[in-house]
Design a protein with these regions (language model features):
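Conserved glycine-rich SAM-binding loop
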Residues: 157
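Class I S-adenosyl-L-methionine-dependent methyltransferase catalytic core
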Residues: 1-142, 146-152, 160-201
């Protein structure tokens, strides 16, 4: 079941029992300054106000309480708030320009891996400035989750993780504070689900 909430993730986390989720995969804002976000986007295209709350100790304490394992994108921007780890995930994009060629994620699990796939900007229509490919989330789930695991995403963003969980049969709870992003992600998931239901001719 895919369960999406248009809510502040802190409000939702407060309602969760300890270890309610086997795995949290989170892509939070990395900075409290919109200008510090990834360059190259048309500022009028996205709502940067929704991206100005980077992780803090209170958020991380709650996240670690409700989930048994965690994957946190952009951890190098808030490394001082996290426990030390030998496990780092690298998404290698094979691209040039304003964007970083590699994005890093912290993992509580004892394995480091590289997702080495060419980044194709035209593979989806962007609805969020830090949108990641569905294939990346599918890879994370196949390598870091087990069948039957319940997944948490506190910053749903574009909803790529929701599509990946739907494709692979994982239960997901996703939270998104910004109403516009939430509605866009929900619509994107619904369109994907409806396409899968179209009978073959």
């Amino acid at each position: 079941m895919i369960e999406l909430h248009n809510i502040d993730c802190m409000e939702y986390l407060a309602t969760c029992e300890d270890n309610a989720f086997e795995l949290a995969i989170v892509d939070p804002p990395y900075t409290n300054n919109a200008d510090g976000l990834k360059a190259g986007y048309n500022r009028s295209q996205f709502n940067y106000q929704a991206l100005k709350s980077p992780p803090n100790e209170i958020f991380l304490k709650q996240l670690f309480r409700v989930s048994k394992n965690q994957i946190l994108w952009g951890f190098n921007y808030y490394l001082d708030l996290l426990p030390s780890t030998d496990s780092v995930i690298c998404w290698w994009k094979h691209q040039n320009g304003h964007f970083s060629e590699c994005e890093y994620a912290w993992s509580s699990q004892k394995k480091s891996r590289i997702f080495d796939r060419a980044y194709q900007k035209d593979q989806f229509n962007k609805i969020h400035p830090t949108q990641k490919p569905v294939k990346l989330y599918e890879w994370l789930l196949m390598n870091y989750a087990k069948e039957g695991d319940r997944i948490l995403d506190t910053h749903l963003g574009s909803g790529s993780i929701a599509i990946a969980c739907h494709n692979l049969g994982f239960d997901l709870v996703g939270c998104e504070l910004d109403t516009d992003y939430f509605n866009a992600a929900k619509k994107r998931l619904e369109q994907h689900q409806s396409q899968l239901r179209i009978p073959m001719q």
